């Protein structure tokens, strides 16, 4: 009984978070699919063919690929592109560069989606006010801007207080959406022919080029499917699957069937079939409910962007940024000020640049289809490397999906000149940023490793009794380093400038595992190097906060007890100088240095006590 109750609670939560985006697609998907074929009048067979395409897109891409297959391809319960990438990197042999590029491409495309989704969904909901009264037409964009500004403003306060309402509100949305669709199916029962895939195939065959263009709009029905996989860790596989089959899929199917039947009976309703299905007395409540649903969908995408960025930082794809927890009970509720500001300006720019959901819908789709293609390619590697499927089995299983998604991608590429270039530019920008950071840090590590002094040699030299030996002082010093085999720069500079060495010196390395979380018993390890030097290692999962001060307490089991007030933390601060011979172009050197300078201070990122931190600087030519 308790398990059943927990399943229901998690399923309800997933309705609000996981399915918010795909649940708002009926607002505009069918409307946009009708536009390319409506210039010379739309026949009944064309309408049935369109609805058939939508239903089968939901069935093949969402139900089969995501709900039934990808939810099983988890990294210790976590999903998402970067989580899958981290899992594959463990056993990758010889083609890590390809996997890395695919991973950052998927992540970059998701960021583009996170900008477009709030703008498109909120605009499409608020535009329903035009049908309430045409006098409000000029206020659609200002109202949408105010709603979006409020949404981004409250992020720093956290959404814990209102997140409990997300599931119930979105459930009401799906019930209303499914009910209004069910009612209007009676307008023309011939719409049930849409379940026959013959009508979908016939539409594409008969329409030719226009049919390919229409596919770009049909794909809007499955936008948000990536959220199923990305939010796997928050809710688990069974609740997400249960919510899809009992609530979301039936409601979406009923609504699309209802819209199709409604337009078959009322061809003049093609301008906005979703809202026109509602009677006039219910139109304003429907607009309000739709707006609430789009706000919740936008919140889910923003939260997903925060989570994805944290993963990218911990995996070394982005520089450190400030990360704040907005809930004492939910570790997944985080706030990244830099990402929030970037998304806010990006969303505002899109609203003002396009001005309507109709115009913005042309830009939508490329980022989502691109991300889906990336996920399918990574899934192929997953089947081979993790499930040990023969290559031809894996190819045979995923080739139909890959071909279908590639066709959708091609259809969306036709919209580049109408605004489709926007998500491509956004994704390209973030690919360059992540590639530059990864490449720059690798070059920096190689250069410093080349000039660094091996730690073992250093310990022998300082512990040798001589008149040049540093003065021994009481207390404990912890030196943070990324390379435990080399002497930390801060330790060298401390001896060079202060001529002292503490009684106890700990060389601390912080590593990020290719798993979401690391058990506490595996978090820390100790290796004694000499009487005065000890090597410490902390290991965190890519979904965890790297709180060094808190993790120090775990060393007690190894017989080490740290008194924070008598312990000094030594950090090296590098002043990077560009070098024409670095291996990167000059512009990339400059970008890497700018990213490094923008990174948050390590003492803040690792939660070190600020009054116990000593930073020692050095120049490094990159």
From Swiss-Prot:
GO terms for molecular function: potassium ion transmembrane transporter activity; symporter activity. Keywords: Cell inner membrane, Cell membrane, Ion transport, Membrane, Potassium, Potassium transport, Symport, Transmembrane, Transmembrane helix, Transport. It is a multi-pass membrane protein. GO terms for cellular component: plasma membrane. The chain crosses the membrane at residues 7-27, 50-70, 96-116, 132-152, 165-185, 210-230, 244-264, 282-302, 334-354, 360-380, 391-411, 416-436. InterPro entries: K+_transporter (IPR003855), K_trans_C (IPR053952), K_trans_N (IPR053951), Kup (IPR023051). It catalyses: K(+)(in) + H(+)(in) = K(+)(out) + H(+)(out). Pfam families: K_trans, K_trans_C. It is found in: Cell inner membrane. Transport of potassium into the cell. Likely operates as a K(+):H(+) symporter. Belongs to the HAK/KUP transporter (TC 2.A.72) family. This is Probable potassium transport system protein Kup 1. It comes from Rhizobium meliloti (strain 1021) (Ensifer meliloti). The gene is kup1.
